[in-house]
Amino acid sequence: FVLPFDVLDSGRDLDRGWPYA
């Protein structure tokens, strides 16, 4: 399980497919 830290930090990662950055 990986928390969407990148999503919380920057919405741009949503387009990249979170929680991966």
UniProtKB/Swiss-Prot annotation:
Induction: By infection with Phytophthora infestans. It is found in: Vacuole. Keywords: Protease inhibitor, Serine protease inhibitor, Vacuole. Tubers. GO terms for cellular component: vacuole. One of its GO terms (molecular function) is serine-type endopeptidase inhibitor activity. Has a single chain structure. Belongs to the protease inhibitor I3 (leguminous Kunitz-type inhibitor) family. Inhibits trypsin and chymotrypsin (serine proteases). Does not inhibit elastase, subtilisin, cathepsin L nor papain (serine and cysteine proteases). Protects the plant by inhibiting proteases of invading organisms, decreasing both hyphal growth and zoospores germination of Phytophthora infestans. This is Serine protease inhibitor 3. It comes from Solanum tuberosum (Potato). The lineage of its organism: Eukaryota, Viridiplantae, Streptophyta, Embryophyta, Tracheophyta.
